Amino acid sequence: MLVYGKVNFTNLSRYSCLSEKTYRRHFLKSFNFPQFNQYFLEKALNPEHTVIAVIDCSFLTKSGKKTDGKAYFYNGVAGKSEEGLEISVISIVEIETRLSYSLSVQQTPSRPQIKPAKKLPQKPKNCWSRKTRKKPDSQSSKPDITRVDDYAQHLKNTRYFFPSSVRYLVADGYYYRSKFWEAVRELNLDFIGKLRVDAVPTLSLYR
């Protein structure tokens, strides 16, 4: 359906016999989009062609002050982190036709940013006692769950809907981290991507 103006519940009701409240009630219910997209993938894909899975993120500009999930994400177009929304997209790509079919899209939740530890004020050595002297804990500021964990969980939730012939997962260098790499191995997939600059390959991964 093609509509003029913004795509919201109010505008959709103008092009339909349903009211705005009906659209809002329906959107409150959960819907299995990966299963829905899987049905059409089975009709669109050629069983004789080679297919691979691809995962990547997309930045969405958002100026609202109370938007859920709004945080600072990397914007590839601007080449820097900006405030907005981010979605994680998993697609199935047909090699021969070079067509990409979106299978699952998930919004990246906002996570607390890692803040540098505050420096303690300098005091004379005589004012410090052994009982009160404490070293700043650098690990306390690190979040337990990171965005890499969100991407890995998104992959785990979508793996069931992959075509049976999918063997390879393609992603850029950002995903080449231990948490995401371990999730790929658990799902019996082969990872294709560019190594990070600080990556240290070991032979134990291939044994």
Positions of the model-derived regions?
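Phosphate-ester processing/binding pockets and catalytic centers
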Residues: V3-G5, F9-Y15, K21, K29-N32, ...
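Intrinsically disordered, low-complexity segments enriched in small/polar residues
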Residues: K21, K70-Y72, L99, V166, ...
